C-alpha cells in the first residue's frame, strides 16, 4: 500500500512575508511627515503645484501588493488563466466590514498581461476567505518560481534594457534579485538553451547569498553570481593568461540599479519619513557616478545600459547622468523611450535643479563641500544632453512607488578617450581594485565576514571521459550535441563524489579564465546527483537541469503516463506497481516502467490540450514501487494547477494512514547523498 504524501503546512511563510512585526505594529503610529522633505521637493517643482497634495497623500499610503508571472515559463499563460478564472471573479465586488474592496487590476504597461496589482489591506487578506485562497495560490506559485512579488516600478528597468537570448548581461548591484530574475527570464525567452548569460553582482557578501536564494528558483545554467564592489568591478578575461586588452569581456547589456537614498520607497520603508535629509543624496552621488562610469567602461559598442534609482532626487539622478554625458561626450547617448511601455504614465527628466545642504541652505558651484557635478548643466550642455529622455515615475501617477530610469547607448567604444576626461572626483575606473576612494559599501563588506562556504570550494571542470560521467552518458543516452565539457564539481579534488553541475558553454570559458580574479558565489545547475551504488547507474539527473537535458536524452528511460497516473503519483508516495495495476490507472505505463532497470527514469505526461504544455518529470523506479521526484512545493503547485486540488488546505494525514514501505530504501535517501530527494519539476 502506498503512503499518502505529507501535506503538512509546517512553517509555511506568507507571500512576501518578513519578520517585521514591530514595524507593522507601529505603521499607524509613525508620523508620516517630514518638513525638510516637503520643503525640498516643493522647491524642486518636479510636477505641477496642484498635484502636490495628491502626491503627498499617495506617499503616505501603504504600497499595493504587485506580482508578475514568469514570462519565460511555457506555462505562463496557463498560470495567468488560472488566476483570472479561479481567483479574479471571487475578488471582484467584495465587501468587507461594510466597505467595498478594490478588485485586482492588471498593470497596463507590463508585456503580455503578466503583472497584477492588489491594493488590499492586510486585514482583509487575513480575514476574507477568498483573498486568503488567493494568497495561498501566490505562495505556492512563488515558491516554484512561476511568479515573483516585485514592486511595480522596479519591473521597468529590465524591460527597457531589452535583453535577448544571445546577450551577455551584467547586473552591477543585483541584490535582492527581482530585477535580475527578469533579466534571466528575458534571456530564456523562447529557448531553454540561450547562448548568452547573466552575471549578477553585489558588493555585500551576505546579500550575494540572498541573491542566490532568489534566483535558484529559475534553474538557469546561464547565471553566475559574484561578490565585488561595483565601482571597481574587475575586467573579465575571455581566455586565461592573456594580457591582450582586447581579450576582455564587454557586455551587451548592463543594469546599473545603484545604491540610493530610497526616498521613492517611503510607502513601504516608513523610516524614510523620519530619517530623510538632503545629505543622503549628496553623499551617494559620487558612488553612483563611479558605478555608472565603470558600467560604461564595461559596455560593448552599440550596447545598452540602464541607470536607475528608487529616488526622486535630481542629485542622484539627472546630475549623475549629466556628468557621465559630460565625461563621455558623443561616445554615449540617451535613448528616447517614449514609445516603450504604452500605458505607463511617466514624466520627463529635468534639466534644472537647486543644490541644498543638510540645513536646506542653497549652495552654488565652488562652495565648500560641493562637487561641480551636483549642479545643473549649462543651457548649451542641456541642449546636447537631452535629459528629457530620462524617465521619472511619481507615486501618485499610477499608485506606485517613485522611480528614475535612464537608458544609455554606447555609440563608440573609446575607453581611453573617456578615461582621459575623468576628473579627480572619480577613481581610476580601469584599476582592478579600490585604490583611491573608500565608500560605505566597501566598509560594510569588510565588516561582514564572508560565509564559510563562499569561495572556499573551487569550480573544477571534469573530464567528460571520466568513468562516472561515461556511465551517465550511456545510461541516459545523452547525445553528442550536449556540450559534455561544461560539467563541474565544487570540491578541491575535482572528483565527482556527490553532485555534478553544468553551466552554459560561454560561462565555462569565463570561469576557467578568471578563477584568480572573480569572487564567484554561485553558478550552474545540478546535473547529476549520486545515489545508490548497487544499481546500473548510481547517478540520477536532477530535475532542475531537465529543461536542458530533455532535449538531449534518448527515450530509453522515458515512459508516457496519463493524467490519472500523474495525479496518483502526486498524492501517493512510493505506490506499489501491483497496487497501481489493481486500480487500473494506467496499465500500459506499469507494463513499460516495470521493464526498466532500477534507478532514475522520467514520465512524459500529455495534457491532451494544445494550449497546455505537456509535463516531463523525474521518478525513481524501484523493483516493486515508484516515486515521483518533485519537492513539496512543486507537488502542491501541480495538484492545484492541473487538478484543482488545494493541498495547502489539506489536513495532515493521521499516523494510521501511513504504512511502512518495504522498498522505501530503493528511493534515493537524503542521508546517503547529502541533498534532498525532492527537486523542482521541469516541463516540456
Swiss-Prot record:
Enzyme Commission identifier(s): 2.1.1.202
Positions of S-adenosyl-L-methionine binding: 173-179, 202, 229, 257
Catalysed reaction, written as an equation: cytidine(34) in tRNA precursor + S-adenosyl-L-methionine = 5-methylcytidine(34) in tRNA precursor + S-adenosyl-L-homocysteine + H(+); cytidine(40) in tRNA precursor + S-adenosyl-L-methionine = 5-methylcytidine(40) in tRNA precursor + S-adenosyl-L-homocysteine + H(+); cytidine(48) in tRNA + S-adenosyl-L-methionine = 5-methylcytidine(48) in tRNA + S-adenosyl-L-homocysteine + H(+); cytidine(49) in tRNA + S-adenosyl-L-methionine = 5-methylcytidine(49) in tRNA + S-adenosyl-L-homocysteine + H(+)
Gene3D superfamilies, sorted: Vaccinia Virus protein VP39
Database matches in PROSITE patterns: NOL1_NOP2_SUN, SAM_MT_RSMB_NOP
Region annotation (Disordered) ranges: 1-24, 650-684
GO terms of molecular function: tRNA (cytidine-5-)-methyltransferase activity; tRNA binding
InterPro entries membership: MeTrfase_RsmB-F_NOP2_cat, MeTrfase_RsmB-F_NOP2_dom, RCMT, RCMT_NCL1, RsmB/NOL1/NOP2-like_CS, SAM-dependent_MTases_sf
Gene Ontology CC entries for this record: cytoplasm; nucleolus; nucleoplasm; nucleus
Biased composition (Basic and acidic residues): 655-665
GO biological process: cellular response to hydrogen peroxide; tRNA methylation; tRNA modification; tRNA wobble base cytosine methylation
Modified residues (Phosphoserine): 431, 667
Keywords, sorted A to Z: Methyltransferase, Nucleus, Phosphoprotein, RNA-binding, S-adenosyl-L-methionine, Transferase, tRNA processing, tRNA-binding
Biased composition (Basic residues): 1-12
Biased composition range(s): Low complexity: 666-684
Compartment annotation: Nucleus, Nucleolus
Function of the protein: Methylates cytosine to m5C at several positions in different tRNAs and pre-tRNAs containing intron. Able to modify tRNAs at all four positions (34, 40, 48 and 49) at which m5C has been found in tRNAs. May be involved in ribosome biogenesis as its disruption leads to increased sensitivity to the antibiotic paromomycin.
Further details from the record: Present with 16100 molecules/cell in log phase SD medium.
PANTHER family attached to this UniProt entry: NCL1 YEAST -RELATED NOL1/NOP2/FMU SUN DOMAIN-CONTAINING (PTHR22808), RNA CYTOSINE-C(5)-METHYLTRANSFERASE NSUN2-RELATED (PTHR22808:SF1)
Name assigned to this protein: Multisite-specific tRNA:(cytosine-C(5))-methyltransferase
Gene transcribed to yield this protein: NCL1
Amino acid at each position: 500500500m502506498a503512503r499518502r504524501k505529507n501535506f503538512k503546512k509546517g512553517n509555511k511563510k506568507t507571500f512576501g512575508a518578513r519578520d517585521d512585526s514591530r514595524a507593522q505594529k507601529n505603521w499607524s503610529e509613525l508620523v508620516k511627515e517630514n518638513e525638510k522633505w516637503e520643503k525640498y521637493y516643493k522647491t524642486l517643482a518636479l510636477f505641477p503645484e496642484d498635484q502636490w497634495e495628491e502626491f503627498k497623500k499617495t506617499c503616505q499610503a501603504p504600497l499595493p501588493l504587485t506580482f508578475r508571472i514568469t514570462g519565460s515559463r511555457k506555462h505562463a499563460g496557463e498560470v495567468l488563466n488560472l488566476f483570472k478564472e479561479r481567483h479574479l471573479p471571487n475578488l471582484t465586488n467584495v465587501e468587507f466590514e461594510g466597505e467595498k474592496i478594490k478588485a485586482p487590476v492588471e498593470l497596463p504597461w507590463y508585456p503580455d498581461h503578466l503583472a497584477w496589482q492588489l491594493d488590499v489591506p492586510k486585514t482583509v487578506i487575513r480575514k476574507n476567505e477568498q483573498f486568503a485562497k488567493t494568497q495561498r495560490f501566490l505562495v505556492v506559485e512563488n515558491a516554484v518560481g512561476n511568479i515573483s512579488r516585485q514592486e511595480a516600478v522596479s519591473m521597468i528597468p529590465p524591460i527597457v534594457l531589452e535583453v535577448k537570448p544571445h546577450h551577455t548581461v551584467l547586473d552591477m548591484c543585483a541584490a535582492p534579485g527581482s530585477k535580475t530574475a527578469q533579466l534571466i527570464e528575458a534571456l530564456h525567452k523562447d529557448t531553454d538553451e540561450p547562448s548568452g548569460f547573466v552575471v549578477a553582482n553585489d558588493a555585500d557578501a551576505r546579500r550575494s547569498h540572498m541573491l542566490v536564494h532568489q534566483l535558484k528558483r529559475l534553474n538557469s545554467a546561464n547565471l553566475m553570481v559574484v561578490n565585488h564592489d561595483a565601482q571597481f568591478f574587475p575586467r573579465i578575461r575571455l581566455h586565461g593568461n592573456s594580457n591582450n586588452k582586447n581579450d576582455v569581456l564587454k557586455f551587451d547589456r548592463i543594469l546599473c540599479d545603484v545604491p540610493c537614498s530610497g526616498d521613492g520607497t517611503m510607502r513601504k520603508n516608513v523610516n524614510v519619513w523620519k530619517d530623510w535629509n538632503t545629505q543622503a543624496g549628496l553623499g551617494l552621488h559620487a558612488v553612483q557616478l563611479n558605478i555608472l562610469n565603470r558600467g560604461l567602461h564595461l559596455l560593448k559598442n552599440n550596447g545598452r545600459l540602464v541607470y536607475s534609482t528608487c529616488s526622486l532626487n535630481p542629485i542622484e539622478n539627472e546630475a549623475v547622468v549629466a556628468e557621465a554625458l559630460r565625461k563621455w561626450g558623443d561616445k554615449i547617448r540617451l535613448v528616447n523611450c517614449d514609445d516603450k511601455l504604452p500605458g505607463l504614465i511617466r514624466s520627463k527628466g529635468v534639466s534644472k535643479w537647486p543644490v541644498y545642504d543638510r540645513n536646506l541652505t542653497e549652495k552654488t558651484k565652488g562652495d565648500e563641500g560641493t562637487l561641480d557635478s551636483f549642479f545643473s548643466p549649462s543651457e548649451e550642455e542641456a541642449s546636447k544632453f537631452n535629459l528629457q529622455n530620462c524617465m521619472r515615475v511619481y507615486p501618485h501617477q499610477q499608485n506606485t512607488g517613485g522611480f528614475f530610469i535612464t537608458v544609455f547607448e554606447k555609440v563608440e567604444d573609446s575607453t581611453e578617450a573617456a578615461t582621459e576626461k575623468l576628473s579627480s572626483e572619480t577613481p581610476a575606473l580601469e584599476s582592478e581594485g579600490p585604490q583611491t576612494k573608500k565608500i560605505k559599501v566597501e566598509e560594510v563588506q569588510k565588516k561582514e565576514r564572508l560565509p564559510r562556504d563562499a569561495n572556499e570550494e573551487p569550480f573544477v571542470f571534469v573530464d567528460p571521459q571520466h568513468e562516472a560521467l561515461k556511465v551517465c552518458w550511456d545510461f541516459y543516452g545523452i547525445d553528442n550535441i550536449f556540450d559534455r565539457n561544461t560539467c563541474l564539481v565544487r570540491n578541491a579534488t575535482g572528483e565527482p563524489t556527490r553532485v555534478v553541475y553544468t553551466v552554459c558553454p560561454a560561462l565555462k570559458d569565463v570561469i576557467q579564465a578568471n578563477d584568480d580574479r572573480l569572487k564567484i558565489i554561485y553558478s550552474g545547475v545540478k546535473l547529476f546527483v549520486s545515489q545508490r551504488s548497487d544499481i546500473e547507474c548510481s547517478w540520477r539527473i536532477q530535475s532542475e537541469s531537465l529543461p536542458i537535458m530533455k532535449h538531449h536524452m534518448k527515450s530509453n528511460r522515458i515512459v508516457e503516463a496519463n493524467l490519472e497516473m500523474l495525479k496518483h503519483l502526486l498524492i501517493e508516495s512510493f505506490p506499489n506497481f501491483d497496487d497501481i495495476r489493481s486500480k487500473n490507472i494506467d496499465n500500459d505505463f506499469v507494463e513499460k516502467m516495470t521493464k526498466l532497470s532500477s534507478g532514475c527514469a522520467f514520465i512524459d505526461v500529455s495534457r491532451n490540450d494544445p494550449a497546455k504544455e505537456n509535463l516531463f518529470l523525474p521518478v525513481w523506479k524501484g523493483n516493486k514501487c515508484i516515486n515521483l521526484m518533485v519537492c513539496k512545493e512543486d507537488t502542491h503547485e501541480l495538484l492545484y494547477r492541473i487538478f484543482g486540488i488545494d493541498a495547502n488546505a489539506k489536513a495532515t494525514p493521521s499516523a494510521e494512514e501511513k504504512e511502512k514501505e518495504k522498498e522505501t530504501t530503493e528511493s534515493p535517501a537524503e542521508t546517503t547523498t547529502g541533498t534532498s530527494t525532492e527537486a523542482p519539476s521541469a516541463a516540456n
